[in-house]
């Protein structure tokens, strides 16, 4: 399995590499507190978004999701290579486009492409409180494999103690490998 960018087109979307012109669209959703609520980072400033965009342009793991009809970049899907022919998938979308099926459409296209390229397993981790995320994974055919209790923290409280969070782990297997 090569570590290459997954690029695809669906009926409504173009899944592609990031480009410099994405800065405003990227800032629009990475600066939104509700969008990044379950992410390991806080809402970003414009300068932080510029640095994030530089990294995204240079990596094969972040895929920009663009609307075909308007060419607006509305979110991203993460496909990171892991051990044993496995990929980790994640997604973040502009709140103005939630509930439109874009996350499902883009993930489905990338999962199909990954499996046709020999990927054996795709997994995702999410916060149990993020019901929309784990419902999406279940709709995509992922199965919940684990509920890890207080296994990770991103932030600390005022006394500098970790704020521990639970994690659900979901996976989907390629039946042809």
What name fits each language-model region?
Residues 34-54:
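Conserved GNAT-fold acetyl-CoA-binding loop/helix
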Residues 56-58:
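Soluble sensory domains of the PAS superfamily and closely related sensory modules
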């Amino acid at each position: 399995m090569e570590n290459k960018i997954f690029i695809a087109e669906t009926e409504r979307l173009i899944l592609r590499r990031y480009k410099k012109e994405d800065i405003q669209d990227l800032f629009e959703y990475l600066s939104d507190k509700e969008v990044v609520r379950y992410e390991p980072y806080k809402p970003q400033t414009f300068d932080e978004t510029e640095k994030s965009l530089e990294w995204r342009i240079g990596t094969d793991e972040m895929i920009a999701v663009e609307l075909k009809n308007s060419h607006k970049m509305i979110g991203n899907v993460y496909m990171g290579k892991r051990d044993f022919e496995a990929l980790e998938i994640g997604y973040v979308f502009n709140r103005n486009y939630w509930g439109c099926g874009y996350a499902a459409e883009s993930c489905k296209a990338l999962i199909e492409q990954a499996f046709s390229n020999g990927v054996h397993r795709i997994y995702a981790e999410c916060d149990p409180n993020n019901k929309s995320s784990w419902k999406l994974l279940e709709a995509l055919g992922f199965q919940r494999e684990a509920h890890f209790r207080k296994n990770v923290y991103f932030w600390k409280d005022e006394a500098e103690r970790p704020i521990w969070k639970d994690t659900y782990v979901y996976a989907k297997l390629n039946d042809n490998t």
